[in-house]
Swiss-Prot record:
GO BP terms: glutaminyl-tRNAGln biosynthesis via transamidation; translation
UniProt keyword terms in alphabetical order: ATP-binding, Ligase, Nucleotide-binding, Protein biosynthesis
Gene responsible for this protein: gatB
Protein name from the UniProt record: Aspartyl/glutamyl-tRNA(Asn/Gln) amidotransferase subunit B
Domain of life where this protein originates: Bacteria
Source species taxonomy: Bacteria, Pseudomonadati, Pseudomonadota, Alphaproteobacteria, Hyphomicrobiales
Gene3D superfamilies xrefs: 1.10.10.410, GatB domain, N-terminal subdomain
Description of how the protein assembles with itself and partners: Heterotrimer of A, B and C subunits.
Listed GO MF terms: asparaginyl-tRNA synthase (glutamine-hydrolyzing) activity; ATP binding; glutaminyl-tRNA synthase (glutamine-hydrolyzing) activity
UniProt family annotation: Belongs to the GatB/GatE family. GatB subfamily.
Disulfide feature: none
EC number assigned by the record: 6.3.5.-
Reactions catalysed, as given in the entry: L-glutamyl-tRNA(Gln) + L-glutamine + ATP + H2O = L-glutaminyl-tRNA(Gln) + L-glutamate + ADP + phosphate + H(+); L-aspartyl-tRNA(Asn) + L-glutamine + ATP + H2O = L-asparaginyl-tRNA(Asn) + L-glutamate + ADP + phosphate + 2 H(+)
Biological role stated in the UniProt entry: Allows the formation of correctly charged Asn-tRNA(Asn) or Gln-tRNA(Gln) through the transamidation of misacylated Asp-tRNA(Asn) or Glu-tRNA(Gln) in organisms which lack either or both of asparaginyl-tRNA or glutaminyl-tRNA synthetases. The reaction takes place in the presence of glutamine and ATP through an activated phospho-Asp-tRNA(Asn) or phospho-Glu-tRNA(Gln).
Amino acid sequence: MTERVDPKKLIKGGLHDWEVVIGMEIHAQVTSRSKLFSGASTEFGGEPNDHVSLVDAAMPGMLPVINEECVAQAVRTGLGLKAQINLRSVFDRKNYFYPDLPQGYQISQYKDPIVGEGEVLVDLPEGESMTVGIERLHLEQDAGKSLHDQDPTKSFVDLNRSGVALMEIVSRPDLRSSEEARAYVTKLRTILRYLGTCDGDMEKGSLRADVNVSVRRPGEPLGTRCEIKNVNSIRFIGQAIETEARRQIAILEDGGKIDQETRLYDPGKGETRSMRSKEEAHDYRYFPDPDLLPLEFDQAYVDALASGLPELPDAKKARFIKDFGLSAYDAGVLVAERASADYFEAVARGRDGKAAANWVINELFGRLNKEGRSIEDTPVSAEQLGTIVDLIGDGVISGKIAKDLFEIVWSEGGDPRAIVEARGMKQVTDTGAIEAAVDAIIAANPDKVEQAKAKPTLLGWFVGQTMKATGGKANPAAVNALLKDKLGIE
């Protein structure tokens, strides 16, 4: 079957249009207190080689012992990816030499991974979505870290990270643009955070991406791919794909051919650089690790873990749309972070869901973004924001005054109801007072009155003037009704 090509995703070269094909290998650090095969701490930071056991340092005679929590976290992740959980998997030795790999091999999984095929539903701009296939998820050890800036003539090795459990999540080459790739990684990180299986902190290296990029003319077979290693931000993932795709297009249009290789993205120079020729599986001489038995568990173990899973983003989004009447876009924004979704639910409980979403997304998120703060660091609690929504709904304050009240609560804290009482912020509902303000504005603007009778949209100007005259405290509905009556507008 011929694959359908979206013209909007094609990259224009000097001679032809080109399609970019992208597959991702995400390395997600497993959330656990100890490493995959030792009891050493996984805590970030600390002095070099503080969190190292004899197993991590590959001392002779030291044997690996599987960390059951890492196994459980991998199974939870597989379930969250709607993937096949393999009841039997095998750990293999992946043989290669790095100075910061003390064993001379990495314990990974090759032919028999713990998790098989799955999928991720990815939300795209303009309300579109796509399904990205997951090929596999396997457990493996992280390597240590070589330090080259401590001495001009020597390199040092820090093994704190050596042996930390990683989940390598391999996607199918289903992505066709840098935007899709960024959206995929964002969604995958959200799922991992909901599950509590990886914190997704790319700055600390908890989530790293290897990006496989190739280009082809539409309808042609897949081109030769290059792998861009260890991209550590979602923004850089997009830039690396664009840069590498254009490099390959330039070579092909010049009559050259693409060498299969591993490359590194340099965001400072905006280029990818060759690291080494890309290895094939046989180069690593995989074989089952003789120190580890095959990993086996039964379906009851999987079912027990499945029963403890939290509500995941797709299910939560569907529920927000159904229960609170939200648009797909607003629901998607709210479920992007678990803490944001929990905050919204606390505000919306027993209230108008759309009003609650409006205040959380536009006012709260807007202010948090402006100040570079996270939802966990908000000075306005869900209870306080819920009270502000109640005060508007009950007609106690107007929308304009509510924004002033939000600023006070943000800066000073306190009970919104008490602040409204103490500062005289209640909405003016006395029709006599509102009528006096309306009459004064009509009397002062006879020319506008005549224009409004011919052009009813000018009513908004009179409403604005009345609200201004009453300090924003007049009830907007009462103002509208009075003005329509006095101006003779239907």
